[in-house]
Amino acid sequence: PQIQPIIDVLERLAPPALQEDYDNSGLLVGEPQTEIQKVLVSLDVTEEVVEEAKSIGAGLIVSHHPIVFKPLRSLTGKNQVERTVMAALRAGIGLYAIHTNLDNVAHGVNAMMCRKLGLQGMEVLRPASETLAKISTFVPSGHAEPVREDPLHKRASVHVRRAETGPP
């Protein structure tokens, strides 16, 4: 498979719109159309993690924490971030981070920790400034598949539920 369908699944799970302003989640290194066979999942990306991905033949590393938080001014290998990015580039391994959007999603990291701790009566301390809206589209049955396959529809779809109705 290519990297893009994996990104699509991750972004349905934790929409990028839930990412904090300071965060840098998403595909950080690599091309969405790259063909891969395996994915390595880690909390952080380090040179050792890239080496492990390489040794098992993983073409994508999905990490919780992004290796790059601030834009890189150079790529010379002078620090751990640059060396790790360079190692991933050399090995042809994509790097994808799913950070605060996974923390903030209703069924994400924070919710899971609260459940594991047995907490009750949880509420959001600082609601997101941007709210998400759900949009439903109704089309004749014969046109449903082309609409589902349209790239704009795919980008806009976070949760798609299929409902069929009979004639009016």
Predicted stretch roles:
Residues P1-P168:
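Hydrophobic structural segments
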